[in-house]
């Protein structure tokens, strides 16, 4: 039985709304995948070790840290910028502090600017690879080990890059189960004492 008149219009409208909702839901993971594959949008590479080829040419790396509106931590780079030789591994630290009276879990997203440098900036180790949990009042320094691929000097756009900015944004996430269970036990014991 074919739909006619207003029923057909309603069915088409509902179909369009469902399709647009599915497209919106899928856009974030699809864009993330696209950026990781192409290096578009300042997404960095990941490597196990720095290359053996270290150039005499240096490049300035700037560090930036920010928080999502709902993240209660304080978060900043320990050093705002450093010069590294291209191909040499660098080590920088970011400091995070949880001023609240509860454990808070966070996950960091990152990007590199200018965007054409993203494909040449490689992380060896990074706090952003894992979720971070800070206890109440805890302050930590979190490392990131990186290098700039020597191929940047041969790239049509990359060879003009003299400064790269590595930016992180921390977002609050749900506590992992082991922390959430421990907090529930602590809260229950506190209420039973009152």
UniProtKB/Swiss-Prot annotation:
Membrane topology: Single-pass type II membrane protein
Gene Ontology MF annotations: copper ion binding
Cellular-component GO terms for this entry: plasma membrane
Spans within the Cytoplasmic topological domain: 1-12
Membrane-side (Periplasmic) residue stretches: 36-194
Keywords assigned by UniProt, alphabetized: Cell inner membrane, Cell membrane, Copper, Membrane, Signal-anchor, Transmembrane, Transmembrane helix
Annotated TM spans: 13-35
One annotated GO biological process: respiratory chain complex IV assembly
One Pfam family linked to the record: CtaG_Cox11
Subcellular compartments: Cell inner membrane
Protein family according to the UniProt entry: Belongs to the COX11/CtaG family.
UniProt xrefs under NCBIfam families: PRK05089.1
Function, in words: Exerts its effect at some terminal stage of cytochrome c oxidase synthesis, probably by being involved in the insertion of the copper B into subunit I.
Cited PANTHER family: CYTOCHROME C OXIDASE ASSEMBLY PROTEIN COX11, MITOCHONDRIAL-RELATED, CYTOCHROME C OXIDASE ASSEMBLY PROTEIN COX11-RELATED
Protein name as it appears in the record: Cytochrome c oxidase assembly protein CtaG
Organism field: Roseobacter denitrificans (strain ATCC 33942 / OCh 114) (Erythrobacter sp. (strain OCh 114))
Lineage: Bacteria, Pseudomonadati, Pseudomonadota, Alphaproteobacteria, Rhodobacterales
């Amino acid at each position: 039985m074919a739909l006619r008149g207003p029923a057909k219009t309603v069915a088409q409208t509902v179909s369009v709304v469902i399709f647009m909702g599915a497209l919106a839901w899928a856009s974030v993971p699809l864009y993330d995948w696209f950026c990781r594959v192409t290096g578009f949008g300042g997404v960095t590479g990941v490597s196990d070790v720095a290359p053996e080829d270290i150039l005499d040419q240096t490049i300035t790396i700037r560090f930036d840290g920010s928080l999502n509106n709902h993240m209660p931590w304080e978060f900043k780079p320990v050093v705002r910028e450093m010069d590294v030789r291209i191909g040499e591994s660098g080590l920088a630290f970011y400091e995070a502090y949880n001023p609240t009276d509860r454990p808070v879990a966070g996950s960091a997203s990152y990007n590199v600017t200018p965007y054409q440098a993203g494909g040449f900036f490689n992380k060896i180790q990074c706090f952003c690879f894992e979720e971070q949990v800070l206890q109440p009042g805890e302050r930590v320094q979190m490392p990131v080990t990186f290098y700039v691929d020597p191929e940047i000097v041969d790239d049509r756009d990359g060879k003009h890059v003299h400064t790269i900015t590595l930016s992180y944004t921390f977002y609050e996430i749900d506590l992992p189960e082991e922390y959430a269970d421990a907090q529930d036990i602590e809260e229950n014991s506190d209420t039973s004492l009152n």
